[in-house]
Every structure is written in structure tokens, then in C-alpha cells.
Amino acid sequence: MTHQNKKNTWIHAAAGTGLLLGTALAIAADVPPDEPASETIAASIPSVTVTATRRSASLQSVPIAVSVVDGEQLERSNRTAIDTVVQEIPSATFRQQGGNKDSTIFVRGIGTISTSPGVEPTVSTVVDGVVYARPGQATLDLLDIERIEVLRGPQGTLFGKNASSGVLNIVSRAPSAQPGGFADVSWYQGDEKRVRAGVNGSLKPGVVRASVVAAYADYDGNVDNIHAGGSKVNGYERKGTRARVDITPNADTDISLIADWLKADSSPVQTAYQQSSAGFAQALLPVVAGPENRRVNADIAPVIEDVNKGLSAQINWRHNGYAYTSITAVRDWDNTQYTSGNAIGNSAEVARVTSAYPASRDIGTVDFRQVSQELRVASPRIDVGGHAVDYVSGLYYLHGKDAEVYRRIVTTATSVNSGRADYGVTNDSYAAFGEGTVALAQDWRAILGARWTRDELDYRHARTSTQATAFAGVQPATQSSGETARNGWSGRLGLQHDLGATANTYATYSRGYKGPAYNVFFNMLPRDTNALDPETSNSFEVGVKSSAFNRRLTVNLAAFHTEYDNYQANFYDTVAGAVVTRLINAGKVSTRGIEADIAARPTPQWTLNAALAYVDARIDDFKCPAAAAASCSLNGKTLPFSPKFKAYLRANYAVPLPNGLQADFNADYNYQTKTQFDLFQSPLAVQGAYGIVNAAVELSSSEGGWRVALVGKNLADRSYATNLIVNSGYVNRTVPRDDRRYVGITARKEF
């Protein structure tokens, strides 16, 4: 048996085992309990409500693989941004190479790595029903989150903007009718501080409720800049506010108005991880490259400035059992970055640069604005030909306009040269979508969904240069523009079967679609002026969702196989010896695997959670672009940023104390196997397997409305990389916040 056949056999066997386990749990669930009902209720796992199907429904009932993370749990764990949230979701990973502009979320090993404004993300981010069109917008601080849902696999039939790999659905807390508020503070080693406060209540009882939340966070960083006058880098400062007003003018109408504003300044750096050149080692001194190096020698520290803001209005109207929804939104994202493309210095540092290792300084601005409108109707259960049918359908429109300026200054020992590019993209996306469920029998349901999409895209690009020929990292002057329009479709077919009162299984086929793209970036060339073809996917998934022992145990399993065609990927090339990237239709890739989400409540005091994912994402047929400088022998290789196995384990033990107090002891462990960060499979870009242990001890009073906790992060003091970037003669590392052990204290008071 070949290695490939062994893998497929293992996957199919595991999927079958999972379905058998679900059936066994369904049988176990019908066994009468032998304990009093009151104890059963106290020990049961709380029901989780999600909106993954655009209706409020139990997580256990929706025929979609969904991971759910509770907002309060994230706050207590100091996971306050998307890059740390994915630590609790094994099927998801996060990649950030520079600033927020260069960030990507991956689901099941699939994501789009590109800074181009002319490409849409593979994983769509939706916040309170509003799609964020650019990936960089999603790197927000989590101000007042009720929960985060990660929908795995193509989701275009129900979400207004198609997502060929998945959806990150973020839901904020609704205002309470009762007046109240809270304040919480956190402090962690490294002088990381976070303060939040909020108030909410009724402005007009029964009609108007409102809430306002504000937050401030500050962290110097965990990398030392040893340059004269330098300080800590790799930190951040964030401040923002979010206001929400819910209006209920009558029993059939709800209106939600939301405004948010967030300003974030950060100083992300990459440290020298490895060097293979004596010249580079000499230029780097006194910094020494190494796997745990947390020092840089930069004369100008990097700075990323982001301002995210938006307004949205959602109107829900119910009539004759139908629910009509309108979501109108406008958002702005301004991004400015001052970064270095070299580990040994920037444009002002000429003493250490050489012709082999020039210093580069990048200055870029992004001005992005989007307007969106979604109209949706959810039907009641109606009779069609003797079958009960319900459906959700809608129309969607998104207009996005981007304007960017990017300048690169390259310094050698003898010269200073530069290039500047002014470019932008305008896109209009139209869609009609819907999905329905047909009851074939009492325990059998059919799922049918479809979506039509039209994308209209145009770009402009103009670059100037101080040289007539290419020099390190800068192409000669050029100017171009173009436009394209494409229609596409996606859909979903499936069956769902109830195995018993507390278990069901489903099987679905989904077609995903991601629109055309333009590779618009600083070093754009005439060969990049043609539009990239849309990316399509065909996904097959089987799953089981079950609970047993009076909801003391829930087990959700999914097995999937997805094939992508015209995969839009970043291709690494060289310009006068400097590594640059450009987007291409890379050909065919695929991903397959098994996922498990398990929750257990063996006693009222113990809560156990496990999330596991085996994901095999690989390149099937790589299309090498013409005149490529790099080798393209990649068929059969693994896709970057996709470890084969990830696990997240969490345990909490609650101890009731006198006087209404409670002590909670919790610990979590996330583990992943080795990860390849380079599409071209460089052995220098592999992060070995590692695990991170976190723990906390908390004392709280439900009557007093307060809690205080001691939190420990990365207790085993395990250094690791979230990205490794291979350059000529050296490798750089992206250093995560929890690269070393640290502890902190948090406190919260509600009133």
C-alpha cells in the first residue's frame, strides 16, 4: 500500500469510527439517569446557541462544522485579538509577517497570503453581520464579544460575501435591559496593561436599550532594540470604543445601531533566527542569530498605525411568521506602516550595510472604505407538497475603494535609491443567495443551497524610481490600469439524519467560489496586469453531533475532503537579488482531515474540553509562472501554515467556598506538530512541534459581582516562531507575545 493510500485509509477509517461513536452516544443518551434531576441539571453542559445558519439554533443541531469560543473565556485567558484566539481553534491558524496589512487567517490549511487590495480573503470575517472586505481589518481588539464562531468549509450560500474556506463570525454582546456596568483591569509581566469599562441599560424601558464599552491596552514589547537610544519593540498600544443602541418600537420590529472606533499602534519586528553567511553574522553584531534571539539593532524602530471605524444598522421585522432583515454598514480602515526589510538596519544606518546586505526602509499608507447592504428573509416552516420546508434567502451588495501609496528606500555603503508606487482598487460585488431545508421524513432532512455572484474589479498603478533598471527590491518605473467582471456560482447539497433524540449525522457537498483578483502591489510588472481567474472549490463533509449522559458529554466530529482549482497563492520571486512576492493562480491544491470537539461535565465542579484537528493540506498540481526565478517542483508538498495535527485541551475545577465565594482552577494546553512556513519547502522555514501550557487561579463572588485571577502563560517557557522568513543568507523569526513564560493578574467588578 502506498503512503498516500495509507493516509486515505486512515482518514476513512477514522471517519467511520467517529460515526459509530456518535451512534453509540445516541444509544447511551436514551439510558435513564440514576441520579436526581437537580444534580443532573447542575452538572450538564450549557447549551450553545449559534447563528451559523443565519437563524439562532443550537450548536448541536446545525449541519455545519462549527467551533465556538466564549467571549468571557477569551477575556480571562488574555486572548484579546484574532492571532491569539486561533490558539483555541485547531482547524485555524494565523499568519502575520509585518503589519496588519500582511495578515491572513487559515482554515483547514487554506488561506490567501497577499497584501494586494485586488484579492479577497479565502476566510471571510463577519462582525455583527457585517463582512470585513480586507483581511487587515480583522486584526481588531476584541472589545465586547459574546462569542466567536468559526465555520469550517465553504459558506457562500448563507453569508453575504462568499468564503471558499470558512467564516470567522464574531458576535458582540447586546445591551441589557437592567442598568449596570463593569470595569476590569489586567497587568502582566513585561508591563502589559489592559483597562476596560462599560455601562448599559434601558434609556426607555421596553423600547430603547444601550451600551458603551471602552478599552485601553499597552505593551512595550518582548524584543530589545539594542541600538543607541533604542527601547523595547514588538509591542502595541490600542484604544477603542464600541457603542450599541437596540430599539424595539413594537413587538414585530427590532433595530440595532452600532458604532465602533479602534486605534492601534504596534511595533512588530522579525529577529534573526539563523544565519549561513559570515558576512551577515558580522553585519549583525552585536546581535547573534538564534532560535531564541529576542534582540534587534535597528536605528529606526518599525511602527504600524491602524484606525478601524464603522457604523452599521440592522433592522429585523417579523410578519406572518417570516423574519425580514436589513443590514446597512459603512467602514473605514486607515493603515500606515514604517517597516524595515532587513535585519541589520534601516535607511539611516550605513555603517553596517554592504552591497550583499543593503538596508531597506518601507513607508506605506492604506486608505480603504467599504459600503455594504444585505437584505435577507427567513421563512417559517411551511408545507410544500406534504413536506415541511424552511429557508433563508437574501441579496447582497458590497462596494470597496482602496487607495495606497508605498515607498521603498534602499541604502548601501555607496548610494541611496528609492521607488514609489501609487495604486488603488475599486470593487463592486453583487450576490443572490439562499439555503433551504426539506423534511423528507420525521428524522431525515435535505439541505439545498445556491448562490450567484458577480464581481466587478478595476485597478490603477503607477511606479516611479530613481534608477532606470531594477535594484534591490525595486523594479523600474511603470504604469498600468485594468478592469474585469466575472459571474460565479456556489452551492450546497446535503442530508441530515437524526440518530436519536440527542444525536444527528449529516453529509454535505459544497462548492466554493472566490472571485477574480488583480495582483496590485508595489513591484507590480506588466506580467501582473492580467486578472487572476476565480478560485473554486469542491468540498465533501460528513459529521456527527451528539450528546449523552444527560448532556454531561457532547461529541462533535467531522471528516472532510476539499479540492481547490486556480488556487490564488503568493509566489516568491527575486528582484535584483532581493526576495519579493507576487500573486498567481497556483493550480490545484487539496485538504482533507478529521476534526473533533468534545466537552464533558463529569461532576458539577469539573468541566473538560478538547478540540482536535488532523489536517493534511497539500499541493496537487502547481503551475509555475513564466520566467520564474525559483524552482516549482512542488507537487505533493505541504501547504504553508498548516500543521498536520493540532490540539487544544482545557480543564476547569470550581470549588464553592463559604460566604458565596467560589474558587476556579483552570489550565489549558495547545499543541501542534511541525509547521512549514515556506511554499517552496525550505528546510530552514520549519517550526518543530511544540506545546504551550497556561493556567489560572480565580476567586469570585457572584453576589458581590467581582472576580480576581492570577494567570500564568507559557508556563513551560517554550520559545517558538509564528512565522519564519527565509532570505539570502539568513532567516528571520516572528516572535509571539507568549514566546516566554509570564504571569499576570486580572480583576473585574460589576455594578
Task: Tell where the protein language model's regions lie, with residue ranges.
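N-terminal Sec signal peptide and the immediately downstream disordered periplasmic leader
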Residues: 1-89, 251-252, 311, 627-629, ...
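C-terminal beta-signal and adjacent terminal beta-strands/loops
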Residues: 563, 670-678, 699-751
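Periplasmic-side early beta-strands and strand-to-turn transitions of outer-membrane beta-barrels
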Residues: 176-178, 186, 191, 198-298, ...
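Gram-negative outer-membrane beta-barrel transporters
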Residues: 31, 378-380, 392-394, 443-446, ...
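Acidic, small-polar-rich N-terminal luminal/periplasmic segments of exported/outer-membrane proteins
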Residues: 41-178, 542
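Membrane-embedded beta-barrel scaffold of Gram-negative outer-membrane proteins
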Residues: 312-341, 498-514, 521, 533-594, ...
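Outer-membrane beta-barrel translocator/receptor signature
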Residues: 103, 120-122, 134, 143-152, ...
